[in-house]
Amino acid sequence: MIQPQTHLNVADNSGARELMCIRIIGASNHRYAHIGDVIVAVIKEAVPNMPLERSEVIRAVIVRTCKELKRDNGMIIRYDDNAAVVIDQEGNPKGTRVFGAIARELRQLNFTKIVSLAPEVL
C-alpha cells in the first residue's frame, strides 16, 4: 500500500533512483495505491548526468509493493521492496530497461511495454 509521503525505489534506468509519492491518480478519495496504479511523485535521488533531476515532478506506475497481492486463484504475491517505473503522459516508460520482477496484472492494465521490458513476470 503506497500512500503520499511513501518512498519508492525506481525499477528502470530512467535516471531516478528514489521517488516520493505525492498523489495517487484516479478517484479523488483514493487513499492507497496498489500494483498497477499511477502516482505523481517527486524524485528524491537521481543519477548524475541523466535527463531526470532531483526535485522533478513525474508520473510513475507501481510495479512492486511489500503489501501482499491476492489473486483470484488464491495465490499471494509479496515483494521485498516498493518499486515504480517512471512513465510519460501516454503511459510509456521513460527508461529502456526494467529491473527486477513485476506482476502479471500490469499486462491487463495495458502497460504491455513495461511487461515486455521486464526480465521476469510473476
Swiss-Prot record:
SMART domains xrefs: Ribosomal_L14
Matches recorded under PROSITE patterns: RIBOSOMAL_L14 (PS00049)
Entry annotated with the keyword rRNA-binding: yes
GO aspect biological process, one term: translation
GO MF annotation list: large ribosomal subunit rRNA binding; structural constituent of ribosome
Keywords assigned: Chloroplast, Plastid, Ribonucleoprotein, Ribosomal protein, RNA-binding, rRNA-binding
Compartmental location: Plastid, Chloroplast
Top-level lineage group: Eukaryota
Signal peptide: none
Family classification: Belongs to the universal ribosomal protein uL14 family.
PANTHER family hit by this protein: 50S/60S RIBOSOMAL PROTEIN L14/L23, LARGE RIBOSOMAL SUBUNIT PROTEIN UL14M
Subunit structure: Part of the 50S ribosomal subunit.
Name of the protein in question: Large ribosomal subunit protein uL14c
Organism: Illicium oligandrum (Star anise)
